Design a protein with these regions (language model features):
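Non-cleavable N-terminal signal-anchor transmembrane helices
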Residues: 1-25
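C-terminal interaction segments
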Residues: 189-228
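Alpha-helical packing segments of well-folded alpha/beta enzyme cores
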Residues: 14, 18, 48, 78-81, ...
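Hydrophobic/aromatic-rich structural module bridging two neighboring secondary-structure elements via a short loop
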Residues: 55-111
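A mid-sequence, solvent-exposed acidic-amphipathic segment
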Residues: 148-177
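Short, contiguous alpha-helical
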Residues: 16, 24-64, 102-159, 200
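Acidic/His-leaning functional-site neighborhoods
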Residues: 168-198
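Amphipathic, non-membrane alpha-helical segments in soluble helical-bundle scaffolds
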Residues: 4-12, 35-42, 71-79, 109-112
Length: 228
């Protein structure tokens, strides 16, 4: 897991870049989330920032929905929403008890990690408006891949949201020179994807087509996480 100082740097940096991309064309369509305009995306992230700030401060329920921030309001408050989130994350000890909806440690560190990846993916989304999104930083993407399996797949199976499979997904992460093996949740026939950490994280989050990185094995397995 990325340490807290790096997490805060990443959240702040990606949060600012997201705003820059949206403000360059707030009415532009987010290619990776075509139902959203840039202004809609900014409003969504403002809602996430407000929700998590309140949760860390003990003012929100873990099962509450993100506040629905009107796009016109978010255009004015986003910078302050982001700054409050970063400050609250900085001031909250990683081992402080904070409720979480997932099968994960119920501590602030779990949310600090989630915020990094939320902002990284949505920064990438925002930059699709201009047509040339920069990759997610390798260290962030590697941890984002780990979080996907450790938190989302585990919770999805435990909650009955995704059917368990006797199958194994192998990720060959080219820029890191590593190979990650994930059972879903039982060992079975292997399906292999190969790509950079950023590309594979984005494929897991349905921002990139996983078939573009398919090497061998059951192509149908690549649809398995779409219900998570």
């Amino acid at each position: 897991m990325v340490d807290l100082a790096r997490q805060l740097e990443s959240i702040d940096h990606d949060g600012r870049r997201l705003a820059e991309a949206v403000r360059a064309n707030p009415d532009g369509r987010v290619v990776s989330c075509p139902d959203w305009s840039g202004a809609d995306l900014l409003a969504h992230v403002s809602g996430f920032a407000r929700y998590l700030t309140d949760l860390l401060a003990g003012r929100a329920d873990r099962n509450a929905e993100f506040p629905k921030v009107p796009p016109d309001e978010a255009a004015q408050t986003y910078d302050a929403d982001l700054a409050r989130l970063v400050a609250t994350l900085r001031d909250t000890p990683p081992d402080a008890e904070v409720p979480h909806w997932a099968v994960v440690q119920q501590v602030a560190a779990s949310w600090q990690r989630r915020a990094v990846h939320e902002l990284a993916v949505h920064r990438w989304d925002a930059e699709t408006i201009g047509g040339d999104p920069a990759p997610i930083d390798q260290d962030v993407a590697l941890d984002g891949i780990a979080e996907f399996f450790e938190v989302f797949v585990t919770t999805g199976i435990a909650a009955g949201l995704v059917a368990p499979a006797r199958a194994t997904l192998v990720l060959e992460i080219t820029d890191a020179g590593t190979r990650r093996v994930e059972h879903l949740p039982d060992p079975g026939p292997e399906t292999t994807l190969r790509g950079t950490a950023s590309d594979l994280m984005l494929a897991l989050w349905r921002r990139r087509d996983p078939l573009a990185f398919h090497v061998d094995g059951r192509r149908g397995l690549l649809e398995h996480w779409h219900s998570i």
